[in-house]
């Protein structure tokens, strides 16, 4: 009888350890999800700041070009404006790619978390 009780206690201990391990895995995944969400916020901040900078630079180009009237300068300022907008598009595209990668990571992490939770429910 004592052997049966000892075995039951060992089994309970093993089960408790497994549950504890799964909870720890879930907490780690949730931390990684939060970290990825912070990355998304930083990407949005970078994009907002870059767009504001781009608008300011375009406005400066506009002001300078309106004060200096010569064909040569007009072309130069137009080239600057085009170059500035091209750079904005490149940065925006790069940030979009980063955002997509982070969103994919978040989706995978949620999937991994669900898998662990489902396995835990099956074994209960």
Predicted feature descriptions by range:
Residues 2-38, 82-90, 115, 119:
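Short, charge-rich amphipathic alpha-helices with coiled-coil/heptad character
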Residues 26, 32-43, 95-123:
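Long, charged amphipathic alpha-helices with heptad-repeat/coiled-coil character
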Residues 39-73:
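Extended alpha-helical coiled-coil "stalk/arm" regions
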């Amino acid at each position: 009888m004592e052997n049966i009780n000892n075995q039951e206690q060992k089994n309970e201990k093993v089960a408790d350890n497994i549950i504890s391990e799964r909870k720890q895995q879930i907490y780690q995944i949730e931390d990684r999800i939060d970290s990825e969400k912070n990355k998304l916020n930083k990407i949005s901040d970078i994009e907002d700041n870059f767009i504001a900078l781009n608008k300011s630079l375009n406005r400066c180009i506009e002001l300078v070009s309106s004060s200096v009237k010569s064909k040569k300068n007009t072309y130069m300022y137009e080239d600057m404006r085009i170059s500035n907008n091209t750079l904005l598009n490149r940065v925006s595209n790069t940030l979009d790619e980063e955002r997509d990668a982070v969103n994919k990571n978040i989706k995978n992490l949620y999937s991994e978390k669900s898998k662990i939770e489902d396995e835990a429910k099956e074994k209960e």
